[in-house]
């Protein structure tokens, strides 16, 4: 455990006593340093290590602590005024800073400080919360939301109105993760630490949380919390044991590899299911 991690862990145990007036300079400096590192992509709340996703809980704790050490203040983006504890990521950016960052942020895109946006990303009018990581080449389409500490991979498309759940409210153990080369269809919601593995296609209007049954049509298996790599998923229903009613589920209708996905458009994958 590094000294800064130990300091964060200790502060989190005392979080009920920490306020903007009582926080020590050392603790405040440590929290600010961690948020700056997350903002710059030097630290991630979750990362894949040896093929498995690992959540760095101490970083999530630092994000939570950051709300304890600041009072609300007036924020002004030139269009409107706001009252919050977290600055916007672009508050003091000039043209040179945007050019160096290498991504596009159109009017209406709101990104909180303490989230990372990689190069070649496009942010339509959308919201990216503190602690989130958005990797290269990703499109965050209009009215999509990337929740606190969510991890979005390379070349992902989050379609209009998509919701990627956060971990802070309500408090979740692990962040929601969308791996590389995934397509999330319009108005879908992926929440509660669900992992959508690489190359998956989620159709429009699919809702997946930890309690959502994920039914594989080919095998008949039911799983929870993880969409296997290369899955094509639509919304559906499964009957009750007595057949008197049915309940919502997500249905894996087929599996595709990267080669097939590269040759076939998203719409084609979702037709003829």
From Swiss-Prot:
Molecular-function GO terms, alphabetical: 2,3,4,5-tetrahydropyridine-2,6-dicarboxylate N-succinyltransferase activity; nucleotidyltransferase activity
Compartment(s) of residence: Cytoplasm
Reactions catalysed: (S)-2,3,4,5-tetrahydrodipicolinate + succinyl-CoA + H2O = (S)-2-succinylamino-6-oxoheptanedioate + CoA
Main localization category: cytoplasm
Root EC class: transferase
Pathway in which the depicted protein is active: Amino-acid biosynthesis; L-lysine biosynthesis via DAP pathway; LL-2,6-diaminopimelate from (S)-tetrahydrodipicolinate (succinylase route): step 1/3
Pfam families for the chain: Hexapep_2, THDPS_N_2
Chain positions recorded as substrate binding sites: 104, 141
GO cellular component labels: cytoplasm
One BP annotation, GO: lysine biosynthetic process via diaminopimelate
Classification via InterPro entries: DapD_Trfase_Hexpep_rpt_fam (IPR005664), Hexapep (IPR001451), Hexapep_transf_CS (IPR018357), THP_succinylTrfase_dom1 (IPR023180), THP_succinylTrfase_N_sf (IPR037133), Trimer_LpxA-like_sf (IPR011004)
The enzyme's E.C. designation: 2.3.1.117
UniProt KW keywords: Acyltransferase, Amino-acid biosynthesis, Cytoplasm, Diaminopimelate biosynthesis, Lysine biosynthesis, Repeat, Transferase
PROSITE patterns attached to this UniProt entry: HEXAPEP_TRANSFERASES (PS00101)
Domain of life: Bacteria
PANTHER family referenced in this protein's UniProt entry, alphabetically: 2,3,4,5-TETRAHYDROPYRIDINE-2,6-DICARBOXYLATE N-SUCCINYLTRANSFERASE, MOLYBDENUM COFACTOR GUANYLYLTRANSFERASE
Protein family: Belongs to the transferase hexapeptide repeat family.
Assembly: Homotrimer.
Annotated NCBIfam families: dapD, PRK11830.1
Name of the protein this chain belongs to: 2,3,4,5-tetrahydropyridine-2,6-dicarboxylate N-succinyltransferase
Organism: Laribacter hongkongensis (strain HLHK9)
């Amino acid at each position: 455990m590094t000294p800064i991690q130990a300091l964060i862990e200790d502060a989190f145990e005392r979080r009920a006593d920490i306020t903007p007036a009582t926080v020590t300079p050392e603790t405040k400096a440590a929290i600010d340093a961690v948020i700056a590192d997350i903002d710059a992509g030097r630290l991630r709340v979750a990362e894949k290590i040896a093929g498995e996703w690992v959540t760095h809980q101490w970083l999530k704790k630092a994000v939570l602590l950051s709300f304890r050490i600041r009072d609300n203040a007036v924020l002004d983006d030139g269009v409107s005024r706001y009252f919050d504890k977290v600055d916007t990521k672009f508050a003091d950016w000039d043209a040179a800073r945007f050019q160096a960052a290498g991504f596009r942020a159109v009017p209406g895109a709101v990104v909180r400080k303490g989230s990372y946006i990689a190069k070649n990303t496009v942010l339509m009018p959308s919201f990216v919360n503190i602690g989130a990581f958005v990797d290269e080449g990703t499109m965050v389409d209009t009215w999509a939301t990337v929740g606190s500490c969510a991890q979005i991979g390379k070349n992902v498309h989050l379609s209009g109105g998509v919701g990627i759940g956060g971990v802070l409210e309500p408090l979740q153990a692990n962040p929601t993760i969308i791996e590389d080369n995934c397509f999330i269809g319009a108005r879908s919601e992926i929440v509660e630490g669900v992992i959508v593995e690489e190359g998956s296609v989620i159709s429009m209007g699919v809702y997946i949380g930890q309690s959502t049954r994920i039914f594989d049509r080919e095998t008949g298996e039911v799983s929870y919390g993880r969409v296997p790599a290369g899955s094509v998923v639509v919304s559906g229903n499964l009957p009750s044991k007595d057949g008197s009613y049915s309940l919502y589920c997500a249905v894996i209708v087929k599996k595709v590899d990267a080669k097939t996905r590269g040759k076939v458009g998203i719409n084609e994958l979702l037709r003829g299911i």
